Regions:
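A sensor for short, sequence-defined functional sites
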Residues: 20-649
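Sec/Tat signal peptide C-region and signal peptidase I cleavage site
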Residues: 15-19
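Sec-dependent N-terminal signal peptides
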Residues: 4-13, 344
Length: 649
């Protein structure tokens, strides 16, 4: 009874305070003159969380938005909320429009539509609740009250009542609260009532918040409030907003070791990695020609990567942290990241390895408060020397790596029986992702260019080059090879191309040799010869992700990222037509920094012009201070792509 009274009082404090004078709040909130770049503003956004001993949370949300423009009116014309019915319950309790002329309209929430959410590749039965408000006008305000219970990530669905909404790590509570928005927020308040028996740790990142803790007989009340939250200006290629914008992390889990042991135990108890005679037979078949420990791990990883299609179908019980059984995935030959990871663990164990599941966050940083900041499941194998190695069958289909270097500098947590701390994947050296392009060509007196060039690549560069095969039907391969030539010069004629066998990707890095002819490539007149060497113009830019970076910024405010570290070396010898003197050779200053290195040059000896260029992209995630060297390297390569050589005749 005391707890219900306390909750009622807290609701009065958080929501009822605003209800006393909604009209005044709307009138004093400002308009489009005060916020010229915003379509709407949030006047208040309050969340009250009531945490039970089981970890189950009851969440009450009260929000008021004011429309400033027609775009803002369109955005608020429909109220929509997504949820996973296996782990969360959502109820839209109240929707009211406060019109600019003083009228109010209360909407019938029994008319809320509950329907399957649109989905692609992962079909886990997610749903959305929606209520159409209709046409609104600047000056109107929309007030909404939500109630929800449950948690964000699904595990094992319970049988009845609220059991299914209790978090996976029973008895524990966590939350990740964003205190940033793409529209102005005048006040955001987050309050959590938690049993006194639970120890809650929290940290506010990337900013400041007003906080307080109140102690009652059997509960503690934590409050966090931030006012005047303004949209932050996005930078092209920056890291995730959650890495740099204000956010609050809360968790009752003591540390990552506890989370690690729990993750290990929940999958072992479920029997996720038990093998079958059919799986054992397949493992023996895959490993019949394996040469050593690493070859065995590679063969099993690539089988799970290549042969298990990425497609998630809801199996009901078991979605989320619990990995489906190896038997199920082996039968279905499809699944999402956790299924591919679980299949690999099952096969590795069948082969005699010690292997476990792990979790990571693709796309953003995991901070040290042990809240569940995960969106991706991976595999860990213990080598014979005792070291742990991480594997990712989801990200390496037809890629020569076992752990994708597009995930370097990424946090992960291994689920081990002894527990583990949060870790980070190291930087992958650029030379592991080399891209070598070497050419020989000749410019005829009529301006026709004839020549050959060879591309060799490894790691993620190999995967990018090999994409002309991997992501297309075999009938289109020749056309795709030709398109890479035509991107440089639409007049190009592909005479011949040879390449390594794509299906042999595990054994041999990709290598391609083109023979081509390009009529009217160079401008050749009685007075001069003007051209840019073919290799310098950037053939196979599909493997040069750094060239797609927006380099218009003088400085960076936030960390930024590219696809992967890279070592690019481009060389070409061009046989020239007769000429008298060199009028102009492009020059780009060498640079060496924490972000990137660059060197490039031209040399002419008699009738042979030699072009050399080397670009080193040193990592995937960069700090603002790395921007200068990275930007210079990119701009220098672009300059060499566009600036011509000029010879006098």
């Amino acid at each position: 009874m005391k707890r219900l009274l306390l909750l009622f009082c807290a609701l009065i404090l958080t929501g009822g305070l605003y209800a006393q004078d909604i009209r005044a709040l709307i009138a004093n909130a400002g308009d489009s003159n005060d916020y010229p770049s915003a379509g709407k503003i949030t006047i208040f956004d309050t969340t009250l969380v009531d945490v039970q001993e089981t970890g189950l949370s009851y969440v009450h949300i009260h929000k008021l938005d004011k429309i400033l423009t027609a775009k803002g009116a369109l955005d608020l014309s429909v109220i929509k909320y997504g949820y996973d019915p296996l782990s969360a319950y959502v109820d839209i309790k109240m929707v009211k429009v406060h019109h600019s002329d003083g009228r109010t309209t209360d909407f019938d929430v029994t008319q809320v539509i509950d329907y399957p959410a649109p989905a692609r590749a992962i079909y886990w039965g997610a749903r959305e609740k929606m209520l159409e408000i209709g046409r609104l006008y600047p000056g109107d305000a929309v007030e909404v009250v939500f109630f929800k219970k449950g948690y964000t990530y699904a595990l094992l669905a319970g049988e009845e009542d609220d059991e299914r909404y209790i978090p996976p790590m029973r008895g524990h509570y966590y939350d990740i609260v964003e205190f940033f928005s793409n529209e102005p927020v005048l006040e955001k308040c987050y309050e959590v009532i938690i049993p006194s028996s639970k120890e809650l740790q929290y940290e506010f990142y990337n900013g400041e918040v007003r906080s307080s803790v109140k102690f009652r007989e059997d509960t503690k009340i934590y409050s966090f409030t931030k006012k005047d939250i303004m949209p932050m200006k996005r930078e092209s290629g920056m890291v995730a907003w959650s890495d740099v914008a204000p956010k609050l992390l809360l968790s009752t889990s003591p540390d990552w070791y506890a989370k690690s042991r729990w993750f290990y135990g929940v999958n072992e108890d479920f029997g996720s990695f038990e093998s079958t005679p059919e799986i054992d037979a397949k493992v023996n078949e895959i490993l019949k020609d394996a040469k050593d420990e690493m070859d065995s791990i590679a063969k099993l990883t690539h089988w799970c990567a290549d042969e298990i299609r990425y497609s998630g179908i809801s199996m009901g019980e078991g979605e989320g942290y619990t990995l489906h059984t190896g038997e199920m995935t082996f039968t279905d030959r499809c699944g999402v990241c956790k299924d591919k990871a679980g299949m690999l663990i099952t096969m590795l164990r069948a082969a005699g390895f010690k292997s476990y599941a792990a979790m990571t966050m693709a796309g953003s940083r995991i901070d040290y408060i042990p809240a569940d900041q995960f969106n991706h499941s991976i595999t860990v194998v213990q080598l014979h020397n005792g070291e742990y190695m991480i594997l990712d069958p989801t990200w390496v289909p037809f890629v020569r790596e076992l752990w994708s270097s597009r995930e370097q500098q990424q946090n992960y947590l291994m689920g081990l029986p002894e527990g583990a701390d949060l870790m980070e994947t190291p930087i992958s050296p650029p030379e592991n992702h080399y891209l070598y392009i070497n050419g020989n060509s000749e410019i005829k007196n009529n301006g026709t260019l004839t020549g050959t060039f060879t591309i060799e690549a490894e790691g993620q560069s190999d995967a990018a080059v090999r994409g002309v095969f991997t992501y297309a039907p075999i009938a289109t391969w020749h056309d795709n090879l030709e398109k890479e030539l035509l991107k440089v010069s639409p007049n190009a004629i592909l005479k011949e191309v040879t390449h390594t066998k794509n299906s042999d990707y595990q054994n041999t890095p990709v290598k391609m040799t083109y023979t081509y002819e390009i009529p009217n490539y160079a401008m050749v007149t009685e007075d001069e010869v003007i051209f840019t060497p073919f290799v310098a113009k950037g053939v196979y830019q599909r493997a040069m992700g750094h060239l797609y970076t927006n380099t218009s910024y003088e400085e960076r405010v936030y960390p930024f990222r590219t696809g992967c570290s890279l070592l690019l070396e481009m060389n070409e010898e061009v046989k020239l037509p007769k000429y008298k003197e060199v009028v102009y050779l492009p020059e780009a200053e060498a640079v060496s920094g924490k972000g990137a290195d660059y060197s490039g040059s031209y040399e002419v000896s008699k009738r042979i012009l030699t072009f050399n260029q080397k670009v080193t992209i040193k990592k995937r995630i960069f700090q603002p201070e790395d921007w200068s060297s990275f930007k210079t390297a990119v701009n220098n390569q672009r300059y060499m792509m566009e600036e011509p050589v000029i010879l006098a005749r």
